[in-house]
Each structure stands twice: as C-alpha cells, then as structure tokens.
C-alpha cells in the first residue's frame, strides 16, 4: 500500500484486545484503536467496527467458578454486550450504533439488503456502526461462528475498500512463529490456495473463537469482492501509526482483479443452500451456450424443499458441487418439470416463466 486512499473500511477487533485477561473490558489496547478510528474519520474515511468480546466482557459479572455451558455463555454475552458497547462509546464524541447479527440475517437476501441500507444510512449521518454476532440468542444453525468471517461478510455488504483484522500476531507467517524461530512474515499474498491455509496451522485465541485459519477464510471472502484485507497486530501502537502513514505493518491479501458481482458473491460466500438439484453432464455446455441457462430436461433429481428465490446447490450425479443458484421455481414445481421434461405443459411453462436456472442467477464453484 503506497498511499492511504480508503473511502470506507471495516475494522475487526478480537476478544483478546477487548478483554485481555478475560475479566471484563480493559481500555489498555482499545484506546489506541479508538484513536485510530477518530483519525480515520478525520481524514474522511468511513469506519465500520466489528467488535468481538461480549462473552469475555461479561464473564466477570458471574461467579468465577461458573461452568461455561452454552446457556451460560449466552448469558455472559448478553451482559457483556452492554458493557462492551458502553466502553467503546465513551471514547468517542460522535454517536455510535449497535447492530447484532446472526447468519440467518445475512443469508436471507431481504434481511441482507436491510442490513446494507441501515449501515449506509448510519454512515451517511456520521454514526459509527458497531457490529457483533448476536451470541445471546443465536443457535448452531444460525451462527457465523467467528467474527473474522462475519467481518468479511459485513465488508462485502458495505462495499468496503479494506478489511483490517487486528490480531495478536504481526500477520501470516510461512510457519508457526511460536514453534519456529526462523518463521518469516509474509507481507503480501496475491492469491489464496491450499498452501496458504497450510501455513495457518490450528492455533486459536484463548479468549475468542477464531484463529489464523478463520482469518484466511475472511480474507478469501473479502478479496473476492475486491476488498484489500490486512492481518495485523492490534497490540502494537506502531501498527496504527504505520497504517496512517500508508504503510503495511503486517500481511496484506490483494483483492481480485475482477471481483465477483454482488449477487454472485452473496450466493457463494454468505447464502446457505435450501435444497439441491442434480444435473446431467450437459451442465457446462449449457452455460457456454447462447442462452446460458439450465432447462428442465437437464435436471436429474431434486432434493429438499425450497421456494422461488431461495439459494440452491447444483451438483453432478457423482456428487461434485458445481454451483449455487437462485431457484426460479419451487422444489415441488421443479420436481414436476424434472419428471415430465418432455411434456408440452412443462415446455410451455418454461417458455413463459423462464429457465430452471438463468445465467445471471448462478455462481460457479471451484472444482476441487
């Protein structure tokens, strides 16, 4: 990064920075981050904050020998969230707003658009959005699971220029620096593949739920949307000075030269498939043809229940995941079409309503 030319950024702050001793919020490291936010805003940069730490912040409000069951963690999150927001708010002389999200909010397209509109409106009026996963109410099927991936989804939804993930390490190393003295910090990653994930190892924070692997997953989500992604050390004051000077103090993951379109990115990285269709071997040729669509005679089977507009998985007969797509038909109607693809009624219905899957509503998945 040669110069600071951000228009809008997302900052992800982990639990270890919020509550380093797991005993409530501490301002030791947060003050420096708050100052960085103030300075960014002074330069005309819009900031969105994704802040972990509600469980760690609320833990001290309960007896120290309390077993951390799932229900107790939810209670700690509920109590700690108010404490954490109050801590952030006291550092600023401008308003902030709390948004608590679940994966269900993000994977539902209508709610996803609502989140975008809310964030844009807050930014337009100079309000700092502070976002966290709603750990107090979320269930396993609605969890993002970590705020690294949540921050990438938020960055994509907000059309951010950069995602800054503040960690307890300087960036991505070629091997674990805690085990290898000769580990080398990698300042720039041009593309993410299996070799990059192999460098992540399996380390996780003692306070939070994420590790280097989830940060790379977040970088993959963000860079595919054209968002530069940084993994940097949030415990060092010099990190923020160098960022404001236009330097790279950690590891930068470069964005795709040709980012995914918004709808394709949402289907690929955020939406959960509600069902699936099995297609025959003509799938690739159909997409390469003039119409770029999938018709009923190419559907071999339909699994699950889904409605028009739901995201579905497209797979081959051997189980290969080929694509995600928006369903133009309900599962019930699509099953009828698949079973009666040669019927005159089926053909007329597709001529009237459209193909089973159209090119503009499909996101191809990489074949492994």
Curated annotation (Swiss-Prot):
KW Amino-acid biosynthesis (keyword) present: yes
GO annotation terms (biological process): L-proline biosynthetic process
Pathway assigned to this chain's UniProt record: Amino-acid biosynthesis; L-proline biosynthesis; L-glutamate 5-semialdehyde from L-glutamate: step 1/2
EC number of this enzyme: 2.7.2.11
Positions of substrate binding: 52, 135, 147
Annotated binding of ATP, by residue: 12, 167-168, 209-215
PUA domain: residues covered: 274-348
Subcellular location field: Cytoplasm
A GO cellular-component term linked to this record: cytosol
Domain of life: Bacteria
Protein keywords: Amino-acid biosynthesis, ATP-binding, Cytoplasm, Kinase, Nucleotide-binding, Proline biosynthesis, Transferase
Keyword Cytoplasm: yes
SUPFAM superfamilies in alphabetical order: Carbamate kinase-like, PUA domain-like
Described purpose of this protein according to its UniProt entry: Catalyzes the transfer of a phosphate group to glutamate to form L-glutamate 5-phosphate.
HAMAP family (UniProt xref): ProB (MF_00456)
Name of this protein: Glutamate 5-kinase 1
Species of the source: Pseudoalteromonas translucida (strain TAC 125)
Lineage: Bacteria, Pseudomonadati, Pseudomonadota, Gammaproteobacteria, Alteromonadales
């Amino acid at each position: 990064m040669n110069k600071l030319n951000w228009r809008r950024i997302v900052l992800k702050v982990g639990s270890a920075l919020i509550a380093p001793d797991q005993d409530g919020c501490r301002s030791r490291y947060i003050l420096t981050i708050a100052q960085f936010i103030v300075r960014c805003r002074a330069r005309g940069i819009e900031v969105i904050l994704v802040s972990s730490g509600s469980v760690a912040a609320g833990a001290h409000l309960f007896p120290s020998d309390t077993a951390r069951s799932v229900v107790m963690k939810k209670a700690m999150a509920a109590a700690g969230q108010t404490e954490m927001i109050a801590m952030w708010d006291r550092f600023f002389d401008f308003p902030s707003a709390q948004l608590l999200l679940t994966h269900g909010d993000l994977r539902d397209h209508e709610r996803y658009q609502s989140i975008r509109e809310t964030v844009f409106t807050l930014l337009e009026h100079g309000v700092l959005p502070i976002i966290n996963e709603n750990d107090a109410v979320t269930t396993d099927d609605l969890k993002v699971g970590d705020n690294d991936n949540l921050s990438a989804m938020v960055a994509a939804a907000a059309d951010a220029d950069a995602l800054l993930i503040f960690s307890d390490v300087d960036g991505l190393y070629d091997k674990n620096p805690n085990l290898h003295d000769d580990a080398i910090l990698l300042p720039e990653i041009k593309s993410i593949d299996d070799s990059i994930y192999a460098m992540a190892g399996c380390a996780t924070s003692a306070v939070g739920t994420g590790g280097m692997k989830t940060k790379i997953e977040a970088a993959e989500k963000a860079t595919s949307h054209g968002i530069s992604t940084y993994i940097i050390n949030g415990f060092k004051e010099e990190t923020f000075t160098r960022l404001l000077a236009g330097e790279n103090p950690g590891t930068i993951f470069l964005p795709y030269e040709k980012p995914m379109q918004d709808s394709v990115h949402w289907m690929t990285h955020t939406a959960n498939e509600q069902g699936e269709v099995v297609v025959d071997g003509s799938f690739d040729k159909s997409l390469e043809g003039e119409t770029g669509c999938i018709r009923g005679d190419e559907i071999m089977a339909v699994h699950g229940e889904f409605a028009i507009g739901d995201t579905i998985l497209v797979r081959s007969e051997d189980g290969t995941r080929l694509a995600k797509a928006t369903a133009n038909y309900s599962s019930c109607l699509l099953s009828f079409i698949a079973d009666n693809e040669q019927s005159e009624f089926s053909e007329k219905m597709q001529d009237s309503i459209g193909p089973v899957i159209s090119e503009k509503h499909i996101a191809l998945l990489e074949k492994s």
